[in-house]
Design a protein with these regions (language model features):
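Low-complexity, intrinsically disordered Gly/Pro/Thr-rich segments
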Residues: 130-141
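Short, positionally conserved secondary-structure boundary motifs
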Residues: 7-83, 96-97, 107-111, 118, ...
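Well-ordered beta-strand positions in beta-sheet-rich domains
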Residues: 86, 113-115, 136
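Short, basic-rich loop-to-helix N-cap that marks the start of a DNA-contacting helix
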Residues: 1
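SH3/SH3-like beta-barrel fold
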Residues: 125-127
Length: 158
């Protein structure tokens, strides 16, 4: 019925193959590395705080020097990202439409974690939580918007 033997289904027989293990095939160039947790970022709109005492957290990445973690504060990205979650950020200065990013805006360096949307000649910083409003940045104000990186993963700490 299944074109196999009972021994194979019971794990008693496994044919030898030249196919690499799934982990090698898909994650071979990635390494488990300690990535620094460099501070906090508001899920709302507020300050990006850099502090030294947050420690490190493991992540499976290709180029660990180009990543950092931030502790998320606030509830504007709920229900998907909670207060206290860790956001793994890839350092880069551009984002694709729809990416989650850590963005710094304004003269005082206000930092936030939001979905990045380009609409015509403006950028929309979009929260997941419908209780919060989008922030639309246009014109001259776009000169005050800086991208710190793209959020590639979040994880909850219990």
């Amino acid at each position: 019925l299944l074109n196999t033997t009972a021994d194979y289904l019971l794990g008693l027989y496994r044919p030898v193959s030249n196919v690499s293990a799934p982990e090698e095939r898909f994650f071979g160039s990635y390494t488990e590395s300690l990535i620094p947790v460099i501070g906090t970022v508001k899920a709302g709109y507020g300050a990006l705080a850099f502090e030294e005492d947050y420690g490190q957290e493991y992540a499976r990445v290709k180029d660990p020097a180009n990543y950092f973690y931030l502790v998320v504060r606030g509830d504007s990205m709920e229900p998907r990202i909670q207060d206290g979650d860790l956001a793994l950020v890839h350092k880069q200065d551009t984002l694709e439409n729809g990416d989650l990013g850590v963005l710094i805006y304004g003269d005082e360096g206000e930092g936030t974690l939001k979905r990045y949307i380009q609409r015509g000649n403006c950028v929309v910083l979009q929260p997941f939580n419908p209780a919060y409003h989008e922030r639309v940045i246009r014109g001259e104000d776009l000169n005050h918007l800086h991208i710190a990186g793209r959020v590639v993963e979040t994880k909850a700490k219990w």
